[in-house]
């Protein structure tokens, strides 16, 4: 019998819905895989085997009763980043301050997965409160890249990406604040999409930076990712930033793209995201991908977005400022960790709790954000960063007057060794150079595997970017490229 963990989500869905295999069998196969290999990768913080099998059995019983599947992915299990609230398992955000905390409500995204009949295998590891690019900032230990367990799996969503790459889950959910879906996808040879800001509900997503955070789908193929995208997208009145608009036709676009015809599509190569400072193997892989797009019939032109050179500086003022505000809620008074050594004032309890509960990177960003928002510095730092953010959005708008999509490497580097950059925050931040602009503008982007770097035989990703509310363009181009590229090596 075929190892069910080797099949893509779309294949599994077809077999489950035709009752060739059961959802319980598929779910159990992945739970067995987790039990067998996750001690090596540490992709999961919590495994919910009993709940997942109950959800799978409900799907099987419904299908046996002659009912239509609840969704195109009904019965296919998923790994959920541990930053979305769940009532039946802990939500820790990989932080000591929330260790063991169980939320009183499900996130909207969690509810959508349950309603779609998608069993949740468990919660995946991340950088604490989604702050990091390597998943080394987790309070519960780093995740390891299935391609090379001495290397990082990207971040902040390295757990979700590693679960996919190691065949512990056929689907996963991540969040993307500055590249936290796309960069892990690139360095694990998986697919990840940052949807248009406001198209996937943030209700129940523990906030890092509210104007940047966006939940999104992850898979091993473009079609799988599109199928999941349509499940989780949609307006939510409980999220004030949610866009009230129809879900984009991303599945149809992925199927169209797989036919391999990009005639009439204009692709822009961003001059500022193609540098000699990038790893040579990454540039070579990207250049080869661009040639492949040309061969598919796309018209490729170079475009300039000058303000992108300031994206990193802008992002690392906007994000810490919002972090400083959002994480003020962890005050030891309402939920989470409480350090109280007796005879302590409320201020002392709060200070002791935050000192013990937050890790170094979270503290660093809180301090930077508090400083940037302080009296006398607000305009010079935060205000200036917002102006640059506007310029970045304008550069995107000008570019999209000429082209349909933009492309770049997803990350300038392949995955580095665990511990290599922990003591150098700036070196770590540079891995997000190519992904940050999309978040600052609120647009959408995807990372698709583009092969292995000739430098070190490690994965490289092609980033495809599109305007807000044009997510389907990502899937058409991504699926066309994926089909033309053909199969690539897998981690395991």
Curated annotation (Swiss-Prot):
EC numbers: 6.3.5.7
Domain of life: Bacteria
Known role: Allows the formation of correctly charged Gln-tRNA(Gln) through the transamidation of misacylated Glu-tRNA(Gln) in organisms which lack glutaminyl-tRNA synthetase. The reaction takes place in the presence of glutamine and ATP through an activated gamma-phospho-Glu-tRNA(Gln).
Record's catalysed reaction(s): L-glutamyl-tRNA(Gln) + L-glutamine + ATP + H2O = L-glutaminyl-tRNA(Gln) + L-glutamate + ADP + phosphate + H(+)
Gene Ontology BP terms: translation
Record's keyword terms, sorted: ATP-binding, Ligase, Nucleotide-binding, Protein biosynthesis
Cysteine pairs bridged by disulfides in the record: none
Pfam family membership, one: Amidase
Assembly, per entry: Heterotrimer of A, B and C subunits.
Catalytic residue positions: 81 (charge relay system), 156 (charge relay system), 180 (acyl-ester intermediate)
Family membership noted in the UniProt record: Belongs to the amidase family. GatA subfamily.
Enzymatic class: ligase
Protein name: Glutamyl-tRNA(Gln) amidotransferase subunit A
Gene Ontology cellular component list: glutamyl-tRNA(Gln) amidotransferase complex
MF (Gene Ontology): ATP binding; glutaminyl-tRNA synthase (glutamine-hydrolyzing) activity
Gene3D superfamilies the UniProt entry points to: Amidase signature (AS) domain
